[in-house]
């Protein structure tokens, strides 16, 4: 499974289960031949591969106000603190993967965020390898890129 898709589904599942904190870390070797997911200490969420993509995605969610924060733990895992309204409903209503490993979607800056009128964000991958949201792309006059996901 694609790393970003795995992170998106883990965040969705954690919000449905009303979890406050998620922990993500790299694969741990169980045997000489196999790599498997190792459950976290609380045994609620599987740990997924932490890459620069995950860090950039969490940075964008934090800057846009969708999560309270994220940090690196002593063991190298990624800790994400989810955000909820006072009624207990998660701030993130919907997360949708747009570009998939088998079907890539690209867009120019002119076609970004016109139909949503500022509701939610679209996350793009740049040619330099980092992630930016559609608002940053409009401000910096970025030409366009691969549309990874949308968050509402």
From Swiss-Prot:
GO CC terms: mitochondrion; ribonucleoprotein complex; ribosome
Protein name (record): Small ribosomal subunit protein uS8m
Recorded name of the encoding gene: RPS8
One Gene Ontology term of the molecular function aspect: structural constituent of ribosome
TM annotation in the entry: none
Gene3D superfamilies reported in the protein's UniProt record: 3.30.1370.30, 3.30.1490.10
Keyword entries, A-Z: Mitochondrion, Ribonucleoprotein, Ribosomal protein
Organism name: Marchantia polymorpha
Primary site of residence: mitochondrion
Compartment(s): Mitochondrion
GO biological process: translation
Family note: Belongs to the universal ribosomal protein uS8 family.
């Amino acid at each position: 499974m694609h790393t970003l898709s795995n992170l998106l589904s883990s965040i969705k599942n954690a919000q449905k289960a009303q979890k406050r904190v998620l922990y993500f870390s790299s694969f741990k070797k169980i045997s000489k031949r196999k790599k498997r997911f190792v459950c976290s200490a609380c045994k609620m969420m599987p740990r997924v591969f932490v890459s620069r993509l995950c860090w950039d995605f969490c940075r964008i969610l934090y800057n846009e106000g969708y999560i309270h924060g994220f940090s690196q733990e002593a063991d190298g895992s990624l800790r994400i603190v989810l955000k909820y309204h006072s009624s207990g409903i998660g701030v993130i209503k919907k997360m949708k993967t747009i570009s998939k490993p088998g079907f890539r979607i690209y867009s120019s800056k002119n076609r970004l965020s016109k139909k949503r009128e500022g509701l939610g964000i679209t996350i793009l991958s740049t040619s330099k390898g980092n992630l930016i949201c559609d608002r940053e792309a409009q401000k910096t006059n970025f030409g366009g890129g691969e549309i990874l996901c949308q968050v509402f």
